[in-house]
């Protein structure tokens, strides 16, 4: 493959319609909201879960965003975690307010305020990158030290991913298809780099831990919001922002200069930053050739391939990897 794949982030999920939710769930939501639901938009087709997610209009004039999932789906636990976490975030963290929750049968629903916004990074512009950077700086400051108790370490979240490059080298896992032709040559260095993770990917900051452009919203006033707070962990204060850099670089933003000037990263050792990017690249090398899980479209696997590609490209520049065979 000679170029990174294109991904349509407006079509990454296949979610149920409002009519597919059990009547008991819809009634429980109306009771929890204290208002009848008069209209529900078609479900959003972004994100990487198969849970219901759509804007709703209420008789009292409010607009809200409803997410609901049945027990057994990843989204069921994710929505519960978000409902637990968001009310504990400091006011400086700009996340949609949780309005209410509801349970019925084996379903859980969480309702948040509706933010009329757009996803940045399609592609990144300098203005949107500055907005996202500012949000990451403010959020990191507000969440250090973590105001939430009992969080797992970020390293624990990615512990198994650290093993992926070595597994590929050992023949225990296949190298995914359609990546840069030079990837096999740099796998030994990638495997070495991720071994720093136990000492690097720890810290006292509560991190979003899954910050991507599709987990950001820029509203009509230009304000940047952070959504989907179900992977919160303890880690270095810079990981959320650094996780945005490789795809932004791929789309024309000079992140190599930005990382030397930003207060989140200016004093962080190069190997620490590169280790984190290497771990995310390793994670993206898992399973991109398999069919997507239920509720996701094939765009999920192309997203993995795009992120593996761009994170490896970013490392290749930073570490002078041999991308041309001589």
For each predicted feature, which ranges?
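A conserved alpha-helical element in kinase catalytic cores
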Residues: 64-105, 122-138, 239, 248
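Short acidic/glycine-enriched loop/turn segments that link adjacent beta-strands
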Residues: 47-50, 104-108
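Active-site activation/catalytic loop segments of kinase-like enzymes and analogous catalytic loops
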Residues: 238-268, 277-296
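Juxta-kinase regulatory segment immediately upstream of eukaryotic protein kinase catalytic domains
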Residues: 1-40
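Conserved short submotifs of the Hanks-type protein kinase catalytic core
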Residues: 106-118
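ATP/Mg2+ or Mg2+-diphosphate-binding catalytic cores
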Residues: 13, 255-256, 284-326
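Active-site acidic catalytic loop and adjacent metal/ATP-binding pocket
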Residues: 45-58, 65-66, 191-239
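A cross-family kinase active-site recognition segment
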Residues: 2-3, 119-183, 202-204, 233
């Amino acid at each position: 493959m000679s170029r990174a794949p294109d991904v349509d982030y407006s079509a990454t999920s296949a979610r149920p319609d409002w009519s597919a939710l059990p009547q008991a769930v819809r009634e429980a939501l109306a009771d929890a909201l204290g208002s009848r639901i008069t209209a529900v938009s078609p479900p959003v087709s972004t994100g990487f879960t198969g849970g219901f997610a759509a804007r709703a209009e209420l008789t009292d004039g409010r607009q809200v965003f409803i997410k609901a999932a049945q027990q057994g789906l990843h989204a069921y636990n994710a929505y519960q975690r978000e409902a637990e976490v968001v009310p504990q975030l400091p006011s400086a963290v700009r996340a949609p307010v949780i309005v209410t929750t509801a349970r019925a049968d084996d379903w859980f629903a969480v309702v948040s305020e509706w933010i009329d916004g757009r996803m940045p990074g399609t592609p990144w512009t300098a203005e949107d990158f500055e907005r996202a950077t500012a949000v990451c700086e403010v959020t990191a400051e507000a969440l250090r030290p973590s105001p939430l108790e009992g969080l797992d370490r970020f390293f624990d979240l990615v512990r198994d991913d650290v093993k992926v490059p070595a597994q590929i080298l050992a023949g225990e896992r296949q190298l995914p298809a359609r990546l840069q032709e030079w990837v096999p040559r740099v796998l030994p260095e990638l495997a070495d780099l991720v071994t720093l993770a136990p000492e690097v990917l720890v810290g006292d900051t509560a991190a979003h831990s899954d910050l991507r452009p599709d987990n950001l919203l820029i509203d009509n006033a230009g304000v940047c919001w952070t959504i989907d707070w179900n992977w919160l962990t303890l880690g270095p204060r810079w990981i959320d922002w650094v996780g945005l850099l490789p795809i932004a670089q791929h789309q024309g933003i000079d992140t190599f200069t930005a990382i030397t000037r930003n207060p989140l990263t200016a004093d962080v050792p190069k190997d620490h930053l590169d280790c984190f990017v290497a771990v995310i690249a390793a994670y993206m090398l898992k399973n991109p050739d398999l069919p997507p899980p239920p509720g996701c479209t094939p765009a999920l696997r192309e997203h993995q391939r795009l992120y593996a590609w761009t994170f490896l490209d970013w490392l290749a520049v930073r570490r002078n990897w041999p991308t041309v065979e001589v």
